[in-house]
């Protein structure tokens, strides 16, 4: 039913005038996807409150976008979204951000073998981020370069060159693959600072005539707003170039960056631009996650009681949430009359999936949803903003029957429904679960949002964003 309605809307391309009442009704049909009633009753589990045809037609907008907000749930496959929704909202519930975008598709995401150029069906975050930031497929571990190690201009670099404000927000270290792909070009994602770059990416090192480590390239890229973790690497000392002998933090300050380290100092910032770009460093490494709970274990769903996730005491009021960082980035970037490009990453869905920690993973998905809500609130008021929500790769968690005797690691959770949901991680040994290669959900709202519908590839996202902003 959904697919036929989308096809009808896209094929007809008849955008008819609608009244304010019709618009309100259309928005409700598309966005309110909660179950309509008692799920034990006939029709109670239905999510549709009416025909979608007019609502979808009204959502189509082929005008250029002034702004783009791209939100990435790292490792957020369909299973991760469903598990988080079941736990936090219930089986008949819905996310007011992730589930509220009207136009939805699926995209493929594979890397390439560096030697043969053939598909590597399971991508890492570096190759996947390079795909949507440059439009180029590459090998796992590469950032901003192709399989021949040639650099390619990123969407952030293009936006900045066109006079747009730019932002890069993540709950990970800012040197981690997803944020780093916007601002760096290195042969290995491990090259965070000068010392490791000299060892693992010698061709990228400043002393060899390269562009430097990821952190040095981040400073050179000079996005207007950069927020996340990774303060530890900024304590490293430059080993070559103009800033040799100074720490990367000292370099940032000398080059005019305003550095903040907690929620209060972030909230106090009122301006950020090329004269005084904002650099938020809120953790030595990755930022603390929202929820705690036991990691999955062998037969954990059978041998241990179901648990309820608890708040992480390390994420106190001094640590800005992803929604708060998104809000501040939008507030600052939207002051540029030419528009802006902003990428926001909920990084630890992936990291907690690797650790087989369902509470950590679910809490980070809820965090991302709150950030999506903030982006949509701005986009609806602004009218010229394209919001896109997707992931970089799929991951290992699966929802299984509570009494399953699974071969992998499992943990049972008490959901909002008062029911038990078991999560299983079974594609790797106990130390770290691995990515998976199934296609991913991509959803959008605003100008050019229709270009995510149907089956696309991760590289299509780069061209969709480039065209929407009219970048050359």
Swiss-Prot record:
PROSITE patterns: ALKALINE_PHOSPHATASE (PS00123). Its EC number is 3.1.3.1. Zn(2+) 2 binds at residues 74, 392-393. SUPFAM superfamilies: Alkaline phosphatase-like. Mg(2+) binds at residues 74, 176, 178, 345. Binds 1 Mg(2+) ion. Binds 2 Zn(2+) ions. It comes from the Bacteria. The active site is at 125 (phosphoserine intermediate). Residues 1-21 form the signal peptide. Zn(2+) 1 binds at residues 350, 354, 435. It catalyses: a phosphate monoester + H2O = an alcohol + phosphate. Its cofactor is Mg(2+); Zn(2+). GO terms for cellular component: periplasmic space. Belongs to the alkaline phosphatase family. PANTHER family: ALKALINE PHOSPHATASE (PTHR11596:SF5). This is Alkaline phosphatase. It comes from Escherichia fergusonii (strain ATCC 35469 / DSM 13698 / CCUG 18766 / IAM 14443 / JCM 21226 / LMG 7866 / NBRC 102419 / NCTC 12128 / CDC 0568-73).
């Amino acid at each position: 039913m959904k697919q036929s309605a989308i096809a009808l809307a896209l094929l007809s391309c008849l955008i008819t005038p609608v009244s304010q009442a019709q618009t309100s009704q259309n928005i409700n049909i598309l966005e309110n996807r909660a179950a309509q009633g008692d799920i034990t009753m006939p029709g109670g589990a239905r999510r549709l409150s009416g025909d979608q045809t007019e609502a979808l037609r009204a959502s189509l907008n082929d005008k250029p976008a002034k702004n783009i907000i791209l939100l990435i749930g790292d490792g957020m496959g369909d299973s991760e979204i469903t598990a988080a929704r079941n736990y936090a909202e219930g089986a008949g519930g819905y996310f007011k951000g992730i589930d509220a975008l009207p136009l939805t598709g699926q995209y493929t995401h594979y890397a390439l073998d560096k030697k043969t150029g053939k598909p590597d069906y399971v991508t890492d975050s570096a190759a996947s981020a390079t795909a949507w930031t440059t439009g180029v497929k590459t090998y796992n571990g590469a950032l901003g370069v192709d399989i021949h190690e040639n650099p390619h201009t990123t969407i952030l670099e293009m936006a900045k060159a066109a006079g747009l404000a730019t932002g890069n927000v993540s709950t990970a270290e800012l040197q981690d693959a997803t944020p780093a792909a916007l601002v760096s070009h290195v042969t290995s994602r491990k090259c965070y600072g000068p010392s490791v770059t000299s060892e693992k990416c010698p061709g990228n090192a400043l002393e060899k005539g390269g562009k430097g480590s990821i952190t040095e390239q981040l400073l050179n890229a000079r996005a207007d707003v950069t927020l996340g973790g990774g303060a530890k690497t900024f304590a490293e000392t430059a080993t070559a170039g103009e800033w040799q002998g100074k720490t990367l933090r000292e370099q940032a300050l000398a080059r005019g960056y305003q550095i903040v380290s907690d929620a209060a100092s972030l909230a106090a910032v009122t301006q950020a631009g090329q004269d005084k770009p904002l650099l938020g460093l809120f953790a030595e490494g990755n930022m603390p996650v929202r929820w705690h709970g036991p990691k999955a274990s062998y037969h954990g769903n059978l041998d241990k009681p179901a648990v309820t996730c608890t708040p992480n005491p390390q994420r106190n009021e001094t640590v800005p949430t992803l929604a708060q960082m998104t809000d501040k980035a939008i507030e600052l970037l939207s002051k540029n009359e030419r528009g802006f490009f902003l990428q926001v990453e909920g990084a630890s869905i992936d990291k907690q999936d690797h650790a087989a920690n369902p509470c950590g993973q679910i809490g980070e998905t809820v965090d991302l949803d709150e950030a999506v809500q903030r982006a949509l609130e701005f986009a609806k008021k602004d009218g010229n903003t394209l919001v896109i929500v997707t992931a970089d790769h799929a991951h290992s968690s699966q929802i299984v029957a509570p009494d399953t005797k699974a071969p992998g690691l499992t943990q049972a959770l008490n959901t909002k429904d008062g029911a038990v949901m078991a999560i299983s991680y079974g594609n790797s040994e106990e130390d770290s679960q691995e990515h998976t290669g199934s296609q991913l959900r991509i959803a959008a709202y605003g100008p050019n949002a229709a270009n995510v519908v149907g089956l696309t590839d991760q590289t299509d996202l780069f061209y969709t964003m480039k065209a929407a902003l009219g970048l050359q």
